[in-house]
Amino acid sequence: MFIVGIDVAKRSHEVCMITSDGQTVQRPFSIRNNCTGYNLMLEKIRKHTNIKSQIVFAMESTAHYWLALFTRLRKDGYHVILLNPIQTSAMRDMFIRKIKTDAKDSFIIAELIRFG
């Protein structure tokens, strides 16, 4: 299984992809919050798998910025998990280095799903 963590924002999203055993298969990358960005994200993910049932997307419910991406992924048949920002904040606090970057947040979102 592949877990795609997405840190959503107004203009761009940070995306990270890991396996269910924690291996990073796609280093964090940025996409624009538009159709071109969406297609770029899927293109990078498809390099690792084309099977939708092997992919779990996860993102925070940050303001309303998550809604378009969440809706499009669900419409396209992907499994998407929406997280409360309090959950990711608690997970971030578990790491020794308290670094907050969008790339790190996308990884933490993916890890949160991996750990259940």
Please state what every model-predicted region is:
Residues 1-116:
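Phosphate- and other anionic-substrate recognition elements at nucleic-acid/protein interfaces
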